[in-house]
């Protein structure tokens, strides 16, 4: 463990990587009992922490940390590790290793956001679902060069270890990042690439063309990810950024460890996502990035909108992802394209093709009238798509609707149905996108290939994770198979190879079987006769279906392989056909469409248009595709393409996967396991069972165990000796030879380590985990000691040298000092002075001579210097010019030398090519001669066949006579058959489904036992489901019949309304008129309310008792009123009561809002699911029960209110003592309340005076405790008295006819109360201030209660209307079960009246009360939105009903689906009804509160009368009272205005609701009509089908009599049966898909709120990610600036070079003239060479194609099963033969079609034997067609093929003679033989022509080669001359220098 200071280098990432030192100390000091602290198994959490309490009889009692006590077995208790192992970084170091220890270690680290943990030799990472600062640049720097044990676990550590291993071991490395989908593999892959691009940066740009390069190699490597993610990643159910393709990124390094280049291999892009997505998923990111409008110029260029919903291909699921900012991602993608060096044209092409794919989804086609042919439904979309692809829109539409098909010798247009065209468009869109993606990968690889020397690479693997969806198809099988192979690779590497290594090295080791072998599942998928093998085999048969594929799978594997199972049928889940047991779980697969996906066909006519597109990129994408036009033109290389084009998707996938596994096996792997912590993507949450499942599947525990038990580290003896000899050099004697193994043994024995931690093998020494790290530390310490000693020696030596210098300097100083002292002593001596004076004079004469001489020499030197300077300047100028000349000559010589070298190489290549071509010409010549012989043989055969055909013609004439008779006799029946065929074509699906079950049962006995069981299971399942649903319907009907007569009457009334729905418009107008005439409706509603109230009183006997109790309480209140004398105290209590009521009202309002939400949710569900109306059959009886429950709730509420009031009295008594403290709070409350009435300033002054008065009143409260108690009792009892108003209101409605509505009555009552209060306040001014606030509070409470009451009444009315509407819909589905029409009419009349009464009563409740304006506006808006949704749903329903007209038999299944939905919604209805009952209880509670508030007003009035005595004391407040009255009048007016506004808003909302009800009724009417129409059409279709069956039987009998074709009819039945089975499977899949979509929609609706919360979290993550991207963008911009500066420098250098070049050209004109001739000759030589190279490359291409096809033919010949296939393989050599055989095949097909028109399907099946021969000939023709170009080069093999062909012709002739016995077969074969004879004639003629042509070509090629030889000789001579001249120039330059 490192200290906090050492962790500081990691910056802000330190807390997320390792525990702090303080935390480690706390963990070590934490109390811990190793004997009692355990993990215990627990059902919910898997394992929990606990403490052992006792052990008895093999049982252990454990108390968990949560306080629960568990008693479990001994083996369910696991010991806990000491606290110091908490959050341990390497789980292999744990004391106790078991599942709970690993789980909790990961959980605790994850809770601390330490997402990386070592698990032995590999690393485990947990997806945090949030951004963490652990990938910053300082973290990268901190991990660089660190050993694994020196730094915390991290993906950077794994990457650095791989990098260091590559450098030290000189071995390729790979990093395998695996895990399930959504585990974080893609993010970790990007981090690995980021690390390598940072630490191995080259810092240099590649030398590319200007404008083509925008970044360094490391920038390009990093930028490849955003581009690939944009086009290859998408949102799935489990992952917002899921890689929908696999990629293996190889990063190549040079010898020094610097980046050299990189390349990317991709695997299996999920093409189907382009055109189809599930609801919770979306397509590839690029589509939504473009439509994000971040770059408006793209929107304009691509002719698209910014709304993805305008494009069906990309809007089938979700269109936005909270965690992804599509706008910013678009900028990153666009920048990546630029950085990766795409040209501007390529970039525009990428966007255009992407936009074209989006437009493809909008292409519409319709069926021509009276034809099945499809035609375009508008050309606007096609024009846009064609424009973007550089095509002609008319040609595109024509190619889609009328593709060209080759028939015989000609091309004909083929008609397409709408479905076929739609499928073709989808296939083209997927193909364009897939090919564009692969091209982008190839371009990226081309850009990343720097041509620098590279030695080793590190591969990073990122593939799609293991996927288990509700609907799993072929893509999921491929993905899961890849993960299975990788897991097997991991298991084999970790467990098998590791232990085999121990055995091989002779280490004592017991083999441990970890049970992790996945071979069974892998072999089941890929081995011969496995799933892929069977799939490819089925793709080879044209009539194969999904059903036949499934049957073969069952036959081959069901019951034979334990990993292959039959899926379980789960209600609500998509249909599955088989299940596989993978290592990560059981996956159910649906095989629908697998054959088409595997074959991946395309419209060849459209492909031909693509190849001619003006968009070069599109033409390039499809340049290698083979089309029909290309075949017609005889394009060369067509044979190769045709021979290799039929490669299935699964075969290509397996080939790529095998290459990947080969690459991985050749590297040293490093494993990173990614874990999903939870399914909800919640940060910090971990689901124990989910994580444990992944740990078990990934072999984490086993990997830790093998790491702990085994010896994961190993090193060769010689390397060990060399590296660790320094630990103890004395252990290895010097000067004598010693074996490396013995030296290693001695060395290890002499070191102080645990000797059980290593073993000696034959060639290596093996170490336990951690020991090698310990040795490294010891080595580092030893090296540190040695270096320290060396440094000490060096420092000592340097010090001694310095000391010696100091000694020498001191001796020199002593000598100088001695001489100076001696001089000082003698310098004043007289003789010395004389000596000083004379000595200079002695040399003066000589000095003068020397000076004169020196002056002369100086002058000469000066002159010479001037001359030399002038000369030097001349030489310098000349040197500069010569240097320029030299440089230019050097450049020229260098270019000439390079040109000479190139010319020499090309000459050598030409010579070699010449030799090769000569040999090839000889071979071709020989083959041409053989071809001539073959042609002669073919001519003889042709004559022989002509004789045979003449005989066959005679037979044909006889057959024609017979057929003419037959046709005359069946002419009458033929017309009937045609009519029936036309009708059955229109009803193809219906007839197929009706006859399918019968045919399936008839033919089931001819199937194997498994097929029989499968069919019976299907039939039984459907029958049981249908029976069960019918039984459920019967039970529901029985239960409804047992209900009360009232409910039956109401249901009959609703059934009657079905007939009346046709007059719905008139009823809606009547209802609207009634609403507009408010007075008339109010009177009616008052009468109906009286009826309802009387009914309620009859049904609620206990309610009467409650009213009696209310009256008693009222009498008691009257007695208490007389005793109230102290009103001043009542103010405080009233305020307290007000606050309590306010809180209660808030609670009620919250519940009302929740109830309103539930109500709106119920209405929304009713509108969105019209079928759910039938689920509400019991609604009205629940409404009646609701009244009974309301009565009981009232009784309970009364008792609760009494108890509550008692509790309030006690509370108030206790509160009394605290009134002094609460005085200030009351003052603030008074201020707040007054501020709501008038301005703050006026209210403040009044309330201050009132507060002073209240303070006086509070002082008096102490002496009036009893009076306060009575007052409290009075106030609390008022609620009981107000409850009596409920009964009184019903009577008041009859008594007060003058009242217009309940709202006006309340208004008048409030007005009277206000006026009375005004009079009382004028008379009683003293009491006014005390009561004014109480009055205001009471009125406010009344308003709130009234509003809540109104809301409850409105909610109740809405529920009643919704229930009535629902029941009316429910009744519609019951009409077909009613038989007694007359009785139903009478009952419906009575029930209609009752229902109208109840409807009017409900409307009266709505109109009688006010509602909050804001709430109604929101409700109105919400209802409008819901109605719009309902209209959309109705349109979809109508479409579904129209589809039902074509799918009569499917009606029962749809009915079962609706019944299932009925059960689900019925449960929801019950829940809603429970809520309605609770709301009813709350409703009565609100009514009582409202009445209590009114009673409080009356009580206050009486109290004001009692306070008249105090008027004299309050006279001084009269003026204030007047102001208060004025304020109250304003409040009154304001309240009245608000009431009028609310009433108007209510009326508008009510009108809106009634309008919506009218819409719903109209919809119901239309639905009922549609359903009745469906029933009628079903009956008609049944009759038509019966008639068709009878006619068909007669026709078949007639034809059997005339043609004796019973066998053919039986075969026809077999074919129809298979077709019916396929249709049945398709309909079952559609039904299951519909069920799944419905269930998914319901789940999405319920989970919306949770998703919104998750969205906020994702938004936060996205914001943080955006900040990261901004930082990265800034860094990229800085890099770009640096690159721009470098570019400018290069440009300056280039300009300078250009100027130098121009100067050199001027100075070297003479030299240019001499070299010009050489240039001219060289140029001509180069042109000649290029021409030769072109010719040779063409020849080489043709030779390579021929050789390749020869190898293919040899392989196919070995694999051939039948003689026909063998013959087909060997006849590929005959080009012309195959072309004419193709035309013959097409003619034969046309002939077959003509015969099919004259004969029915039975006759066609009778000719099945002939069709087999046709199929063989067709296969032979197709294969012959692919080998056209190889004819001339494989003549020897052609002879053998012709001989076999002769044998085959004899066999065919013999077969023909046998077929003559059968008239119909003979007719078909005769026609084919005629066509074949004609074809052979043309074939022989054209073969002769082709042979002559080829001979002429060969002679021409020989002549050209001779000329090439001459040119090569000339070139050689010219090269020699150039060499001589270059040497002369070079010698001249050297001599000049």
Curated annotation (Swiss-Prot):
Pfam families: Myosin_head, Myosin_N, Myosin_tail_1
Sequence ranges assigned to domain Myosin N-terminal SH3-like in this UniProt record: 33-82
Modified residues (Phosphoserine): 623, 1094, 1160, 1235, 1241, 1259, 1290, 1301, 1304, 1472, 1493, 1512, 1540, 1552, 1572, 1712, 1724, 1737
Binding site for ATP: 179-186
Region (Disordered): 1124-1145, 1151-1170, 1883-1913
Region Actin-binding: start-end pairs: 657-679, 759-773
Residue numbers carrying Phosphotyrosine: 387, 1462, 1490
Any one GO BP annotation for this protein: muscle contraction
Domain of life of the source: Eukaryota
GO cellular component: cytoplasm; myofibril; myosin filament; myosin II complex
Positions bearing Phosphothreonine: 64, 69, 417, 1239, 1253, 1284, 1465, 1499, 1515, 1728, 1734
Subcellular location, record wording: Cytoplasm, Myofibril
Coiled-coil residue spans: 841-1937
Keywords: Actin-binding, ATP-binding, Calmodulin-binding, Coiled coil, Cytoplasm, Methylation, Motor protein, Muscle protein, Myosin, Nucleotide-binding, Phosphoprotein, Thick filament
InterPro entries with a match to the protein in the record: IQ_motif_EF-hand-BS, Kinesin_motor_dom_sf, Myosin_head_motor_dom-like, Myosin_N, Myosin_S1_N, Myosin_tail, P-loop_NTPase, XRCC4-like_C
Molecular-function annotations in GO: actin filament binding; ATP binding; calmodulin binding; microfilament motor activity
PANTHER family, alphabetized: MYOSIN HEAVY CHAIN, NON-MUSCLE, MYOSIN-2
Entry comment, domain topic: The rodlike tail sequence is highly repetitive, showing cycles of a 28-residue repeat pattern composed of 4 heptapeptides, characteristic for alpha-helical coiled coils.
Family: Belongs to the TRAFAC class myosin-kinesin ATPase superfamily. Myosin family.
Record's protein name: Myosin-2
């Amino acid at each position: 463990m490192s200290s906090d200071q050492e962790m500081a280098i990691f910056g802000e990432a330190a807390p997320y990587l390792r525990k702090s030192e303080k935390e480690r100390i706390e963990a070590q000091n934490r109390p811990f009992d190793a004997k009692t602290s355990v993990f215990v198994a627990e059902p919910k959490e898997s394992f929990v922490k606990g403490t052992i309490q006792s052990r008895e009889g093999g049982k252990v009692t454990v108390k968990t940390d949560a306080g629960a006590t568990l008693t479990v077995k001994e083996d369910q208790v696991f010991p806990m590790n000491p606290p110091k192992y908490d959050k341990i970084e390497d789980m292999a170091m744990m004391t106790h290793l078991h599942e709970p220890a690993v789980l909790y270690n990961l959980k605790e680290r994850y809770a601390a956001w330490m997402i990386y943990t070592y698990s032995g030799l590999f690393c485990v990472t947990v997806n945090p679902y949030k951004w963490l600062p652990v990938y910053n640049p300082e973290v990268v720097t901190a991990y660089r060069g660190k050993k694994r044990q020196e730094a915390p676990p991290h993906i950077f550590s794994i990457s650095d270890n791989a990098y260091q291993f590559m450098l030290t071991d000189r071995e390729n490395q790979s990093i395998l990042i695996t895990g399930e989908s959504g585990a974080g593999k893609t993010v970790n892959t990007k981090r690995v690439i980021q690390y390598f691009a940072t630490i191995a940066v080259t810092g240099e740009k590649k030398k590319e063309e200007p404008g083509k390069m925008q970044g360094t190699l490391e920038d390009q490597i990093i930028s490849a990810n955003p581009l690939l993610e944009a086009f290859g990643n998408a949102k799935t159910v489990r992952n917002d950024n899921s890689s929908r393709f696999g990629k293996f990124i190889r990063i190549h390094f040079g010898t020094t460890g610097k980046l050299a280049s990189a390349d990317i291999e991709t695997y299996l892009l999920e093409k189907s996502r382009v055109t189809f997505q599930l609801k919770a998923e979306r397509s590839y990111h690029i589509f939504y990035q473009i439509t994000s409008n971040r770059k408006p110029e793209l929107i304009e260029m691509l002719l698209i909108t910014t709304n993805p919903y305008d494009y069906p291909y990309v809007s089938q699921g979700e269109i936005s992802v909270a965690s992804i900012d599509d706008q910013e991602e678009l900028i990153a993608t666009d920048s990546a394209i630029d950085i990766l060096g795409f040209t501007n044209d390529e970039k525009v092409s990428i966007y255009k093709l992407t936009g074209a794919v989006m437009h493809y989804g909008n292409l519409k086609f319709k069926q021509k009238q009276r034809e099945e042919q499809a035609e375009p439904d508008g050309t606007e979309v096609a024009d846009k798509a064609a424009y973007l692809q550089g095509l002609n829109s008319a040609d595109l539409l024509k190619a889609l609707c009328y593709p060209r098909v080759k028939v015989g010798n000609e091309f004909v247009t083929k008609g397409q149905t709408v479905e076929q065209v739609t499928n073709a468009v989808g296939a083209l869109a997927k193909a364009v996108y897939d090919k564009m993606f692969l091209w982008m990968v190839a371009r990226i690889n081309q850009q990343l290939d720097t041509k620098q020397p590279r030695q080793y690479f590190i591969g990073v693997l990122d593939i799609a994770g293991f996927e288990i969806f509700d609907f799993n198809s072929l893509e999921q099988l491929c993905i899961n198979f890849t993960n299975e192979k990788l897991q097997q690779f991991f298991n084999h590497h970790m467990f098998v190879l590791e232990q085999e290594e121990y055995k091989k090295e002779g280490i004592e080791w017991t083999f441990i079987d970890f049970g992790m072998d996945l071979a069974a599942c892998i072999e089941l998928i890929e081995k011969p006769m496995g799933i892929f093998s069977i799939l490819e085999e089925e793709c080879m048969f044209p009539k194969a279906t999904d059903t036949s594929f499934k049957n073969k799978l069952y036959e081959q594997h069901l019951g034979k392989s334990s990993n292959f199972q039959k899926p379980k049928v789960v209600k609500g889940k998509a249909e599955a056909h088989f299940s596989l047991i993978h290592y990560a779980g059981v996956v159910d697969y649906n095989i629908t469409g697998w054959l088409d996906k595997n074959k991946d066909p395309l419209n060849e006519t459209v492909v031909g248009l693509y190849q001619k597109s003006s968009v070069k990129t599109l033409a390039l994408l499809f340049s290698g595709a083979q089309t029909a036009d290309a075949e017609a033109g005889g394009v060369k290389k067509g044979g190769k393409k045709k021979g290799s084009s039929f490669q299935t998707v699964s075969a290509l996938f397996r080939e790529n996967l095998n290459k990947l596994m080969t690459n991985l096996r050749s590297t040293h792997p490093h494993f990173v396991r990614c874990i999903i912590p939870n399914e909800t993507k919640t940060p910090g949450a971990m689901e124990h069972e989910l994580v444990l499942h992944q740990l078990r599947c990934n072999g984490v525990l086993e990997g830790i165990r093998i790491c702990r038990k085994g010896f994961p580290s190993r090193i060769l003896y010689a390397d060990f000796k060399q590296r660790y000899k320094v630990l103890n050099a004395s252990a290895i004697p010097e000067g004598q030879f010693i074996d490396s193994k013995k030296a290693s043994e001695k060395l290890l024995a002499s070191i102080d380590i645990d000797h059980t931690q290593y073993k000696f093998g034959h060639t290596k020494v093996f170490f336990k985990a951690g020991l090698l790290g310990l040795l490294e530390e010891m080595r580092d310490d030893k090296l540190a000691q040695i270096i320290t000693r060396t440094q000490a020696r060096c420092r000592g030596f340097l010090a001694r040298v310095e000391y010696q210098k100091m000694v020498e300097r001191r001796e020199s100083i002593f000598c100088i000092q001695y001489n100076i002292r001696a001089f000082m002593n003698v310098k004043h001596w007289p003789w010395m002075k004389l000596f000083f004076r004379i000595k200079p004079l002695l040399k003066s004469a000589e000095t003068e001579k020397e000076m004169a001489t020196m002056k002369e020499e100086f002058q000469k030197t000066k002159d010479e210097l001037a001359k030399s300077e002038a000369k030097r300047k001349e030489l310098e100028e000349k040197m500069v010019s010569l240097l320029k000349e030299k440089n230019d000559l050097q450049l020229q010589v260098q270019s000439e030398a390079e040109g000479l070298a190139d010319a020499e190489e090309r000459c050598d290549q030409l010579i070699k090519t010449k030799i090769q071509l000569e040999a090839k010409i000889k071979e071709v010549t020989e083959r041409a001669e053989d071809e001539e012989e073959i042609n002669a043989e073919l001519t003889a055969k042709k004559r022989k066949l002509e004789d045979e055909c003449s005989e066959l013609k005679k037979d044909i004439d006889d057959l024609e006579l017979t057929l003419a008779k037959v046709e005359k006799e069946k002419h009458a029946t033929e017309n009937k058959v045609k009519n029936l065929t036309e009708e059955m074509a229109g009803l193809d699906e219906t007839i197929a489904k009706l006859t399918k079950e019968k045919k399936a049962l008839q033919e089931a006995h001819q199937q194997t036992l498994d097929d029989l069981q499968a069919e019976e299971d299907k039939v039984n399942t459907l029958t049981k489901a249908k029976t069960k649903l019918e039984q459920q319907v019967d039970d529901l009907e029985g239960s409804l019949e047992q209900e009360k007569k009232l409910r039956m009457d109401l249901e009959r009334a609703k059934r009657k309304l079905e007939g009346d729905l046709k007059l719905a418009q008139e009823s809606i107008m009547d209802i609207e008129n009634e609403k507009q005439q408010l007075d008339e409706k109010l009177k009616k509603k008052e009468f109906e309310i009286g009826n309802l109230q009387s009914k309620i009183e009859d049904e609620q006997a206990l309610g009467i008792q409650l009213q009696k109790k209310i009256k008693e309480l009222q009498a008691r209140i009257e007695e208490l009123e007389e005793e109230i004398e102290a009103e001043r105290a009542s103010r405080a209590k009233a305020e307290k009561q007000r606050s309590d009521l306010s809180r209660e009202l808030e609670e009620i309002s919250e519940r009302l809002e929740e109830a309103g939400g539930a109500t709106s949710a119920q209405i929304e569900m009713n509108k969105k699911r019209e079928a759910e109306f039938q689920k509400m059959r019991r609604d009205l009886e629940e409404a009646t029960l609701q009244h009974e429950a309301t009565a009981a709730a009232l009784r309970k509420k009364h008792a609760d209110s009494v108890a509550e009031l008692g509790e309030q009295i006690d509370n108030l008594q206790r509160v009394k003592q605290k009134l002094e403290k609460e005085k200030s709070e009351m003052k603030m409350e008074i201020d707040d309340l007054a501020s709501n009435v008038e301005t703050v300033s006026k209210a403040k002054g009044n309330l201050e005076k009132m507060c002073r008065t209240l303070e006086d009143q509070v002082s008096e409260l102490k002496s009036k405790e009893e009076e306060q108690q009575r007052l409290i009792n009075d106030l609390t009892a008022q609620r009981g008295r107000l409850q009596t108003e409920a009964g009184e209101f019903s009577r008041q409605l009859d008594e007060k006819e003058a009242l217009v509505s309940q709202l006006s009555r309340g208004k008048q009552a409030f007005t009277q109360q206000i006026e009375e209060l005004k009079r009382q306040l004028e008379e009683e001014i003293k009491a006014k201030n005390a009561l004014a606030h109480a009055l205001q509070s009471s009125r406010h409470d009344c308003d709130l209660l009234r509003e809540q009451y109104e809301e409850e009444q409105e909610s109740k009315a809405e529920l009643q209307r919704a229930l009535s509407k629902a029941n009316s819909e429910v009744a519609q589905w019951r009409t077909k079960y009613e038989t007694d029409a007359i009785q139903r009419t009478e009952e419906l009349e009575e029930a209609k009246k009752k229902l109208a009464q109840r409807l009017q009563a409900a409307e009266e409740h709505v109109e009688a009360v006010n509602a909050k304006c804001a709430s109604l506006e929101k409700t109105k808006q919400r209802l409008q939105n819901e109605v719009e949704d309902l209209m959309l749903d109705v349109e979809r329903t109508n479409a579904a009903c129209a589809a039902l007209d074509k799918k009569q038999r499917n009606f029962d299944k749809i009915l079962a689906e609706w019944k299932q939905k009925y059960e689900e919604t019925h449960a929801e209805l019950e829940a809603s009804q429970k809520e309605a009952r609770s709301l009813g209880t709350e409703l009565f509670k609100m009514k009582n509160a409202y009445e209590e508030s009114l009673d409080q007003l009356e009580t206050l009035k009486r109290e004001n009368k009692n306070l008249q005595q105090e008027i004299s004391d309050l006279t001084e407040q009269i003026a204030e009272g007047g102001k208060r009255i004025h304020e109250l009048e304003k409040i009154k007016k304001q309240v009245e205005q608000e009431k009028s506004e609310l009433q108007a808003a209510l009326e508008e909302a009510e009108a809106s609701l009634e309008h919506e009800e009218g819409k719903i009724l109209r919809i119901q009417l239309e639905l009922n009509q549609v359903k009745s129409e469906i029933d009628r059409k079903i009956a008609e279709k049944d009759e038509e089908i019966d008639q068709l069956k009878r006619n068909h039987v007669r026709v078949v009998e007639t034809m059997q009599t005339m043609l004796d074709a019973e066998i053919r009819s039986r075969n026809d039945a077999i074919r129809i049966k298979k077709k019916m089975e396929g249709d049945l499977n398709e309909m079952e899949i559609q039904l299951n898909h519909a069920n799944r979509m419905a269930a998914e929609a319901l789940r999405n609706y319920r989970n919306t709120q949770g998703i919104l919360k998750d969205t906020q979290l994702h938004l936060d993550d996205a914001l943080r990610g955006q900040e990261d991207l901004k930082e990265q963008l800034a860094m990229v911009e800085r890099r770009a600036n640096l690159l721009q500066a470098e570019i400018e420098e290069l440009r300056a250098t280039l300009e300078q070079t250009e100027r130098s070049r121009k100067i050199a050209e001027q100075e070297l004109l003479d030299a240019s003239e001499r070299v010009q001739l050489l240039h001219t000759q060289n140029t001509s030589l180069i042109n000649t060479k290029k021409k030769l190279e072109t010719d040779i490359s063409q020849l080489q291409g043709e030779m390579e194609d021929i050789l390749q096809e020869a190898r293919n033919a040899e392989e196919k010949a070995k694999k051939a099963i039948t003689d026909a296939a063998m013959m087909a393989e060997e006849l590929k050599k005959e080009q012309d033969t195959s072309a004419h055989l193709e035309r013959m095949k097409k003619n034969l097909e046309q002939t077959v079609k003509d015969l099919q028109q004259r004969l029915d399907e039975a006759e066609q099946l009778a000719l099945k034997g002939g069709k087999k021969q046709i199929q063989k000939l067709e296969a032979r023709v197709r294969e012959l067609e692919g080998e056209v170009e190889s004819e001339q080069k494989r003549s020897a093999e052609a002879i053998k093929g012709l001989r076999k062909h002769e044998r085959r012709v004899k066999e065919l002739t013999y077969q023909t003679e046998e077929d003559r016995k059968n008239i119909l077969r003979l007719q078909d074969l005769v026609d084919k033989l005629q066509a074949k004879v004609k074809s052979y004639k043309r074939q022989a003629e054209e073969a002769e022509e082709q042979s002559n042509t080829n001979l002429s070509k060969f002679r021409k090629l020989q002549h050209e080669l001779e000329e090439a030889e001459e040119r090569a000789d000339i070139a050689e001579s010219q090269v020699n001359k150039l060499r001589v001249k270059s040497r002369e120039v070079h010698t001249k330059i050297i001599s000049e220098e």
